[in-house]
C-alpha cells in the first residue's frame, strides 16, 4: 500500500506531528528520510527492506553508501541523506569536549561511553586522558578490531597521553557479544598498561569493558595489581 492510500493518522509525517517521533516505528522514521517509495511499494516498505538487509537497526550505521543503494528505491541522494542521519545519531552520544567532565568513579567513566559504544558491532579500544583533577582533557580511539595485547601496545597509549599532558588515563573497550567478562587478553593488556604507567608516572585508573547496556570496571572486579 502506498503512503497516500494510508489513513491520514497512519502516514509517518502526519503521525509524527500528531503524536511525536517516539510513537513511530523504526521503519516509519526511516520512511520519512527516504521520502518516496518505488513503483508499487511505499517508502515504509523500502525502509523495511533496508532494515532487513542490515539485520538490525544498530547495524545501519555500518552500511556504506553502496550497501544502502542495493535496496531498490534508494539512489545516491537518498543514501547520502540516510548516511548523514546515521552519523548524526552516532555523534549525539559523543560528549562535548567544551564541557568539563570530571571522572570520580567507574560509573562516570562508563557513562561517558556506554550509550555510544554498547551498540558497536566491532571491538573498539579508546582512552580517556585526564588532568591532575581527573577532568577529561580528551578521548581518542586507539584501535579498532579484536583486542590483542600484542596489537594494543602501551607505546601508542602513552604516546598520546604524553602528547595531551595527561596525569592519568582510563582505557575503555567494548565486547560486541554483550558479555563484559574480561578475556585473558583483556587482563594481560591491563597489566602491561599498569606497568608502563608506573614507569612513566601516568597512572592507569581503570579499564572499563562495555557490554550490552552494562559495564565492568576491572578495578572494582579486582583485576588490578595493588
Swiss-Prot record:
One of its GO terms (molecular function) is metallopeptidase activity. Signal peptide: none annotated. Residues 102-224 form the MPN domain. InterPro entries: MPN, RadC_JAB, RuvA_2-like, UPF0758, UPF0758_CS, UPF0758_N. A motif (JAMM motif) lies at residues 173-186. GO terms for biological process: proteolysis. Zn(2+) binds at residues 173, 175, 186. Keywords: Hydrolase, Metal-binding, Metalloprotease, Protease, Zinc. Pfam families: RadC, UPF0758_N. It comes from the Bacteria. Belongs to the UPF0758 family. PANTHER family: DNA REPAIR PROTEIN RADC, UPF0758 PROTEIN YEES-RELATED. This is UPF0758 protein Sca_1264. It comes from Staphylococcus carnosus (strain TM300).
